[in-house]
Curated annotation (Swiss-Prot):
Compositional bias ranges of the Polar residues kind: 319-328, 625-634
Compositionally biased intervals (Low complexity): 351-363, 417-434
Species whose genome carries this gene: Rattus norvegicus (Rat)
Record Pfam families: CFA20_dom
InterPro entries: CFA20/CFAP20DC, CFA20_dom
Amino acid composition bias (Acidic residues), ranges on this chain: 507-521
Name of this chain's protein: Protein CFAP20DC
Disordered: annotated span: 312-522, 589-634
Biased segments, Basic and acidic residues type: 339-349, 494-506
Length: 658
């Protein structure tokens, strides 16, 4: 209709109630009883009156849907009067540069901005009522901000619904000056032909996204939700957010579209549940955090605190009580771990304690109770041990004098935990802090004898239960030897026992490792185990048994020598593929006194009768059988490196038999 008309002026008039038949070009939807023209004495001119329901009573321009207006000016002005307590709405059909037609629904019924790719709902609750108003709508701003990427091209349709009084409709090329406008931006005035009389109270109100946001901030009770309004409101502290927040973008017609989606009950419920889940997860994360966690400890400040386990974790994160640790004064010597005094005798319980006692006798205890599947509590224990490692700035050297029996060297010993059904009790582990491997066995033997009675009882109850790490230590101190047996036995070579221990102790704590080490940086290549065959393991087992028997005969106070302890020091493979493979932790020393490969050499020549008597039963007359049986019962046979050697009692019996 206006496409071929000149629109380069200040305004273009679309509708006026003056004249003989002002609604001739308009499509009127409603009976004459609700839509009519009358003379208004207040404004001293004719006006169009629309009453009744805004859904049914309205006027539309152009009449035919195939026609278009083709209005290209930026601002659309409705000169209207809206009564109190009545709804009013208008609908605008716009076309963007992509020739896509979109609709803007402006109504007092809407309480928030919502949009789809082709439609948008804009609230009009801020409109001035019971006064004549020049309602100026910024078409360019609404198009570009609501429909992302769209650029306004033309206004092609207008629908005005009840309830209102309508005097004029026109477009403006420039922004009009508002009644309460204090901006310094350039603004135009309403054209003289479109102005109301000076004695008629009226206001000019500009409507765009910025005004909608400002109105929301002012009133607070009417939320506006769009991409810009969310950013605008979040930048101001005084704004009030509603729980029904809209998404910045949504899916429409199979593609992702920027802008808020239309409100719906199902979408709000889903969004509310998502926010609830996020808030619950945030509270749980806060409850599981440790408030006094310190990862960097100054070497000068030796009065650092152990990490206290948070009470919130005991209340929310775990069902077991948590006992916080106490700070260590700076005057105390370097603390070392010490076993708790009361190991639990309950096999089904998985409560574990970590005791800390320095050489002066002061004791600090940190307990944490958790189930075997509670990985978070295990991480807390590992973190406490990590900080304990950081506190020990200097390791104990070999030159340190041997402590008296009254105060044995401190070691990690864990009380009983849930074991296999065969009745295995809790496991214990000892970490000797002496650098000399030769004195390690002496220290362990003496301290095991002079330790507390409760500890001795716990050791006797479980002579075969061994504490094994489920993962290889990442920061193993150099020069330290591990005594895996409570009775001083340096190694375990029974594959069956290995599998039993591995299955039973998988619920124990993970390896305590830390980011810092008291010595030089750990090189894993130095501790890479070498593969050993089954025959070599059997040879080591026979060597250990032979050495134990020899030392029992000679009255030695301990097991093997230090070099043999290092050679027999084995660890269980932690690979998930093979849990029964034994690996040697350290290579065999060069200066070892006795080596199993040397023992495999053929023995020195001996009496062939001794070998015949041992490999096959001798032919003995029946009269001498009782004597031979009594003598054979007192003989002992030992195996060393696959070769069979005869002891002195058996040689004597063979001599008598011959």
């Amino acid at each position: 209709m206006f496409k071929n008309e000149y629109q380069g002026g200040a305004f273009v008039e679309i509708f006026s109630a003056q004249g003989k038949n002002p609604g001739a070009k308009w499509k009127i939807l409603g009976s004459p009883s609700v839509i009519w023209k009358e003379f208004d004495k207040e404004v001293k001119s004719f006006v169009f009156v629309l009453e009744g329901s805004s859904q049914t009573n309205r006027i539309q321009l152009p009449k035919e849907n195939k026609q278009i207006l083709g209005l290209i000016q930026r601002f659309l002005v409705l000169q209207i009067y809206v009564p109190l307590g009545q709804d009013f709405s208008t609908e605008l059909l716009i076309t963007d540069l992509g020739n896509i037609k979109r609709r803007l629904y402006l109504s007092t019924v809407h309480k928030e901005v919502s949009s789809t790719p082709l439609h948008a709902k804009i609230p009009l609750f801020m409109i001035k009522r019971k006064i004549w108003c020049n309602l100026c709508i910024d078409l360019v701003a609404f198009t570009s901000e609501i429909f992302k990427g769209a650029v306004f091209q033309s206004l092609d349709g207008i629908i005005v619904s009840a309830n209102c009084k309508l005097r004029k409709i026109f477009t403006l090329k420039f922004k009009p000056r508002e009644t309460a406008d204090r901006d310094d931006e350039p603004a135009d005035i309403i054209p003289r032909s479109c102005q109301l009389a000076t004695d008629v109270p009226h206001v000019t109100q500009l409507l765009n996204m910025t005004k909608l946001r400002q109105t929301e901030i002012k009133f607070g009770g009417h939320p506006l939700r769009s991409a810009e309004s969310d950013q605008f409101i979040s930048s101001r502290a005084g704004s009030v957010r509603s729980s029904k927040s809209q998404d910045v973008c949504h899916i429409a017609f199979g593609s992702r579209v920027l802008g808020p989606p239309p409100p719906s009950g199902r979408r709000n419920n889903l969004r509310l549940s998502a926010e609830t889940v996020r808030s619950i997860g945030y509270k749980n994360n806060q409850s599981c955090q440790q408030p006094a966690e310190e990862k960097h400890v100054n070497s000068a400040d030796t009065s650092a605190l152990l990490i206290p386990l948070s009470e919130q974790q005991g209340e929310k994160g775990s069902s077991h009580p948590v006992k916080q640790t106490t700070p260590l004064p700076a005057s105390l010597p370097t603390p070392y771990p010490h076993p708790p005094r009361d190991p639990s005798a309950d096999k089904g319980s998985s409560r574990r304690g970590l005791g800390l006692r320095s050489s002066s006798g002061s004791r600090t205890e940190a307990r944490c109770g958790s189930s075997s599947g509670n990985s978070r509590s295990e991480e807390d224990v590992a973190m406490a041990a990590n900080n304990l490692t950081q506190l020990t700035t200097e390791p104990v050297r070999a030159s340190t004098p041997e402590p008296p029996a009254a105060e044995p060297p401190d070691e990690w010993i864990f009380p009983e935990s849930s074991g296999p059904p065969s009745g295995a009790a809790g496991s214990s582990s000892s970490l000797l802090l002496d650098g000399d491997s030769r004195t390690a066995s002496h220290l362990w033997l003496e301290t095991s004898k002079d330790s507390d009675p409760d500890q001795a009882e716990g050791t006797q109850m479980a002579p075969k239960d061994i504490f094994t790490f489920s993962s290889r230590p990442r920061s193993a101190p150099h020069g330290k030897s591990h005594d895996l047996s409570p009775t001083g036995c340096p190694c375990i070579l029974d594959p069956k026992e290995d599998s039993r221990v591995t299955k039973g102790d998988t619920e124990l704590e993970d390896d305590f490792y830390g980011s810092d080490s008291s010595e030089e940086e750990y090189n894993w290549r130095n501790y890479q185990p070498s593969q050993m065959s089954e025959s070599e393991l059997q040879m080591l087992a026979s060597l250990r048994r032979q050495q134990n028997e020899d030392l029992e005969d000679t009255g030695a106070p301990h097991g093997l020598s230090a070099s043999q302890v290092d050679n027999c020091n084995v660890s269980i493979s932690t690979s998930s593929d093979d849990t029964t493979t034994w690996n040697s932790c350290l290579p065999p020393p060069v200066n070892q006194g006795r080596h199993y490969q040397k023992e495999m050499n053929p023995p020195s020549p001996s009496n062939p009768r001794d070998w015949l008597n041992m490999l096959s039963p001798p032919i003995v007359p029946p009269s001498q059988q009782p004597l031979e049986q009594s003598l054979d019962s007192s003989a002992s046979l030992s195996v060393q490196g696959g070769a069979l050697l005869l002891t002195q009692p058996h040689l004597a019996s063979c001599a008598v038999g011959c």
